[in-house]
């Protein structure tokens, strides 16, 4: 059953009595998939999801990063992690299961809208994955939010239809709120697309929670001073898919010359680069070493003006026969095999943290941010 804060009323498919949603098709007990879709008045064919909460972004950071992830993007990544979900509680702490076109919840009011595709993915695959529970929360800018749960009814012998439970929150649903932190303690795995503008807070929270997680982000988030140490210590790494992803964007977004399109339905789309998945769940890809063939020579691999390390502009050209520290593009993180290379630092501003070694400059010319790596077979001398 679904707890809700609405006045008692009667509808064709369900009864709202004493603030309880009772579904007619399930003997006034459980909300089924299709009644749930009608209850939310959502367009189930819509292939989008909010990549970070727009209200939170716009009201707290002043940034415009309201994007909607395609369901196919979620499916392409999560198919590699199915073994992790059996019997687990999954928490999507930046996902609204029913968000209207104007950005506000239209739970049962007939206003139309669409649903979070992270919620949608786990709703559609709840029994296939063998989930124990799904919890979703999201931020509301000007009013209390709610949590929505799908709860397994399996008794070990017979598979039952899951219950759908909607419960008002006292607070706004911010992932840092006491209510959401308590839900984080309850869960086993977090899967979501968090607010990109708050990744300096979000990723450390996930890592220090001790929970497993799989979240969308940008590769450059790894080089934030608040986050980099966790990549260096192999407490987080990149998932399977990365690169340029298309996201649906609101109508008020301005058209751009590149990485922008409008489809046949008039929907605007933006393509974002360096998008990736961050996770602490071990995957086979992570242990596949790079196939390298280049050998070191000082002409092809110049030393930085600012630090005793060499520049390598392409991950495929990392030399195989040097013990020196090598500066490589951030895209290396998508190919990092911890048995092959250790991450020793980063070359960015030279002052962001103890691991920010120097500004990457070669022959007086600055390079883009680099990850500092070294072969794992490096033998330290007595002077090091």
Report the location of each language-model feature.
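Class I S-adenosyl-L-methionine-dependent methyltransferase catalytic core
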Residues: 4, 9, 13, 21-23, ...
